């Protein structure tokens, strides 16, 4: 595999994983408040 392909896959994985994480953090902050 090329480094470019690996880089694109890692970026996509981070974006997909960051979605639910951001929602969870916002929900946790609202819950704490």
Swiss-Prot record:
The source's superkingdom equals Eukaryota
Cellular compartments annotated: Plastid, Chloroplast thylakoid membrane
Q: Does the keyword Thylakoid apply?
A: yes
The entry's keywords:
Chloroplast, Membrane, Photosynthesis, Photosystem II, Plastid, Thylakoid, Transmembrane, Transmembrane helix
Membrane topology per the entry is:
Single-pass membrane protein
The UniProt entry's GO biological process terms, in alphabetical order, are: photosynthesis
Membrane-crossing residue ranges in chain numbering: 5-25
Task: Reply yes or no: does the keyword Chloroplast apply.
Answer: yes
Q: Which family does it belong to?
A: Belongs to the Psb30/Ycf12 family.
The entry's function note states:
A core subunit of photosystem II (PSII), probably helps stabilize the reaction center.
Provide the assembly information: PSII is composed of 1 copy each of membrane proteins PsbA, PsbB, PsbC, PsbD, PsbE, PsbF, PsbH, PsbI, PsbJ, PsbK, PsbL, PsbM, PsbT, PsbX, PsbY, PsbZ, Psb30/Ycf12, peripheral proteins of the oxygen-evolving complex and a large number of cofactors. It forms dimeric complexes.
Task: Report the protein name in the record.
Answer: Photosystem II reaction center protein Psb30
The organism's taxonomic lineage, starting at the top? Eukaryota, Viridiplantae, Streptophyta, Embryophyta, Marchantiophyta
What's the encoding gene here?
psb30
């Amino acid at each position: 595999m090329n480094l470019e392909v690996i880089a694109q896959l890692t970026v996509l994985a981070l974006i997909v994983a960051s979605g639910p994480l951001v929602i969870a953090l916002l929900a946790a902050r609202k819950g704490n408040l």
